[in-house]
Amino acid sequence: MIVDGRLATVVIPRDAIEGAQEPDKAVMQAVVGYVNDIQRSGVYPRHEMPAAAMQTYHAVYYLAQVNNGGHGQFIRNTGIAMLPTTSGDALAGLKAMGALAQHQILVEMLAWVKANLEQAAKQNGFSARGDVLKALDDRFHAAEREKPIARLAARWIAGWPGLRIVGREQYQAEIDRLAQLNPHLPQRRVWQSVQQLRLQMTDDPRITIAAACGAVKPQPEVKLEVRPGVNMEIEGQQCMAFGVGTNKGARLCVFEKTGGRLYELDRSGGRVAAGAQLSTVGADKVQQFVKVAGQVRAAEAIDLLLRKAGLDPLAMITAWEVFDGGVTWIVATGQTRAAAAINGDGAVLTKPDQTPIAGAARDDIERYAAVAATGGESLRPPA
């Protein structure tokens, strides 16, 4: 049910909480799972979700971040720009469940951030951890020992009027039913699908990794997976390196402002290190991929091609070739590997032996881009 523009129902599976060793935490995590599932399936933005569910979601996020790396990690991982929204939800949830001590601590943290923006931006919870935040961490942990958020949240959640506890076999059907209540669902699903491709084409680390894989000679390597980046020493220098899975195996990709370098992953001697260098790609080449991809609407084109071919649009892409007015990507989806060549005239998806799989004219791509744009616009909060 949708009431005043928001979903009014929260569904959690019974087996997620019955028999759990820590039932209070299990209830919280079930709500987090619901938020993730319904936002993925129904493409509901925050302002269309049940308010209490979003408040719980961000209160649990706050709890997890502080427990792991203190308020400094919470600030770092949330980002200064998103801190007011995330903290606003968490504060509302903490107040509603009765976690008043933790609520006050978060209020004080926000006041400190507002007064010390430059210092706040440097916090990470570990190597950079301000004295004020250390004191807040200590108070938070003391409050948790006295009145843990999990216990308070579980009691609060149990009283929600829109809560439905169902069998596991019913859970996905209920998520699908709630998703179908979204009047903008088809356009939003196109937007959501296009966005995950666009992110791979525009986010600096992701596109650099994609281009470094595509630059391997004599044959490009197909990017299949990217793991979180870590600081490590490579060739005598501290670098930001990402674990990468390709069709040839495990790799490391160094990301720098000047570009990227792809290495074999060396696990000999019980350590993780960079092995032989496989490729290098400069920032200029990376930005050329970004520019041309935007000009020819590469994200929309690939999504359209995959759907026309009956393939899963949730794909990983490798930046292979770029030239004035055109770009070619290697697309990996499921067990399929294909090349997507896109230019001003249109796009074609081909098998490794160059057999065409699907094609799209420029007009088709532009119409599809308009559908995605409509879906994106519908996600904006009302004025």
Predicted regions and their residues:
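Membrane topogenic helices and adjacent juxtamembrane segments
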Residues: 1-52
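Generic hydrophobic, helix-prone segments enriched in Leu/Val/Ile
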Residues: 26-34, 149-154, 208-213, 253-255, ...
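Charge-rich, solvent-exposed alpha-helical interaction surfaces
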Residues: 30, 34, 93, 135, ...
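Surface-exposed polar/charged interaction patches
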Residues: 37, 41, 65, 69, ...
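Core of folded catalytic or high-affinity ligand/protein-binding domains
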Residues: 45-141
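Long, amphipathic alpha-helical surface segments
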Residues: 118-186
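Charge-rich interaction segments
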Residues: 171-242
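Extended, charged low-complexity segments
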Residues: 229-383
